[in-house]
Amino acid sequence: MRLAIPAYRGYNRAAMRTDYFQQVLNRLQAVMESQQQAMEQAAEWLADALTADHLIWIFGASHAGILTEELVYRAGGLAPVSPIFIPGLTCDVRPITLTSTLERLDGYAAAAIREVPIQPGDVLIVHSVSGRNAAPVEVALYGKERGARVIALTSLDYSQSVHPRSRTGKRLFEVADLVIDNGAPRGDAVVHLPGFAQPVSPVSTILGAAILHAIVAEACAILLERGIQPPVFLSANLEGGDEHNARLMSRYRGRVLYL
């Protein structure tokens, strides 16, 4: 049953669409300027790991895990990116609210990842917009315990406005080795409609994907400067893509979790 509200006929509908695009563009520009140093450091860390034949790991819970999928087995992306998918923390579970329950549950993520073979010299990227729940904090702490460099991709505006829900008493940005602020607002959504109190249309996925792909591009440039061929996937829908990718995957089989 839909909820009836008084009709509001003052909308410029196209302006709402334009507003979202403008919000994204403005925030991308702001991130590009304000996070330049952090992204450069992240690119150096990725390049260092790949130079030494180490892996890049990535984790996010629920919708934050979309960026895990975005970096893994991706045309134009790095082959040695190993995903951390924790049961119950991906968007294919039913009921979907289970993701929120388990992300907040102290000890759940820590128990789920204790056999993940992160090694010293690896890089671990943990994505959480609010950064307040137990799961991303526990994954980040595990990565540090294992000797990896831990990068937090989060919203400082959002995270600093909320209390931690982890028994550690910490938020993600407080436990990572490097913090990249994605520029998303508190609550993530950015379009405000007249007559409707709740903002709509989140931005963190777009901002986060742009940040990570930009870091990968710079890391590949660093590898080339060092005389190292970047291990990058070709689209499987281009001629020769399957063969190219098979060679890359054989190199990392047994180390990258999805292989």
Positions of PLM-derived features:
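A short, well-structured juxtamembrane/interface segment
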Residues: S34-T51, A112
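Glycine-rich phosphate-binding loops that contact phosphosugars or nucleotide phosphates
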Residues: W57-V216
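Short, positively charged and aromatic/hydrophobic N-terminal segments
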Residues: Y11-N12
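Generic N-terminal amphipathic, Lys/Arg-enriched alpha-helix
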Residues: A15-S34
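N-terminal glycine-rich anion-binding loops that anchor highly charged ligand groups
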Residues: A15-D19, T51, I56
